[in-house]
Amino acid sequence: MGYYYWDPTYILVVIGAVICMIASARVKGTFNKYSQLRSMSGMNGAQVAQRVLQAAGIYDVQVRHVSGSLTDHYDPRTKTVNLSDPVYNATSVAALGVAAHECGHAIQHAKSYAPLSIRSALVPIANFGSMLAWPVILIGLLFNTRSSGLIIDIGILLFSAAVLFQLVTLPVEFDASRRALVMLRTQGILADDELRYTRRVLKSAALTYVASAAAAILRLLRIILITNGRRRDD
């Protein structure tokens, strides 16, 4: 008979995964629901993006179409607002909200919004940390030497950089949504009742980032529990 070992800290990973799944399902459901509601302005996502950028005095950012669903993003390296299939040509209140949100990031970039600058600086560090954290920690756990504790701490620090990136992302996303709603209202693109629906779409999207941050914190907590348990055993 095989021997099976259950690590109780796995529950933290499971909780994080469930939170992310619920948030993802909610944003998809909310977007699909309000994708059926056409805006009274009749403008599509690309037109709204151009309108918002011009209203913000930004003329060096291009609006592009990208394939996929909900793959919308702003790329500060190429200064492009990239809108996906359900947004670029769509006229729904959901699509216009997403388009304006991505323009919110372009406005942040143009105004040197501090949290966005910090997040951009953290990207290579977070990628490096998330890739090497576990290998470094495993080396520290497997090789019982005087420097094992230091190696483990380095691994935890590397993973903490990835967690920090997730946390810094939160104010960036919330602020982009705030800027989007202000632009949609002041430019007369959406009526007040339409803004209420768009706010729901953007709020559900923001919750996915909250879920990702929570999951990252839970994974970090698991790492700390595992390594502390090993240290006590030693």
Give the ranges of each region predicted by the language model.
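Polar-ligand-bearing catalytic/cofactor-coordination segments
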Residues: 2-7, 24-129, 164-234
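Post-HExxH zinc-binding segment in Zn-dependent metallohydrolases
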Residues: 123-148
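Hydrophobic alpha-helical segments embedded in the membrane of multi-pass proteins
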Residues: 132-135, 155-160
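Alpha-helical transmembrane segments of multi-pass membrane proteins
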Residues: 17-22, 140, 158-169
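N-terminal, Lys/Arg- and Ser/Thr-rich interaction peptides
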Residues: 10-26
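Hydrophobic alpha-helical transmembrane segments
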Residues: 5-13, 147-157
